[in-house]
């Protein structure tokens, strides 16, 4: 894949420009992946493979993938590795986690992103970003909805959180949000239950 080849080439260099280009390529790849995921979810042949998944493994992979954004925006990452495991589909769960982390980075200009594991089997991702207005919160999981922040930043596709909710529904997990304008957002994925649900 050309995008992957370019990313590997750029990672061999350590400069501000290479990190910026790597970040831009990652975002292009994310948009492509969102479209493909949207199409897969609409297919009757979507397969889910449930097994014991180590959250630290998935988190580590996504943190490494997004490290260029952390570096470019000079944001702190607060995360203590955990040995927590859940029963889920690793590929689909990884997509959800990447989307949430990517959103946290996108809408946080200073401060930090904090990743923690709460009981029972709940992944919590918090940021010190611009937050979501109370009137937008009930609609952020709707397809195509970008809200005020999305319109202002012109970075939102209106698909990311919609896909996260759809995937979590299919996995039998639950996704929730708490946010305050000017203080940040906390997203939680509750994975104490799982179930392959066909639509």
Where are these regions (language model features)?
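Short helix-loop "hinge" at the ATP-lid/N-box region of the Bergerat-fold HATPase_c
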Residues: 104-105
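Short beta-strand/loop element within the Bergerat-fold HATPase_c
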Residues: 112-122
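Conserved micro-motifs of the catalytic ATP-binding
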Residues: 43-48, 81, 85-91
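Short conserved segment of the HATPase_c
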Residues: 132-145
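A conserved beta-strand-to-alpha-helix junction within the catalytic ATP-binding
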Residues: 49-67
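Glycine-rich ATP-lid/hinge loop adjacent to the conserved G-boxes
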Residues: 145-155
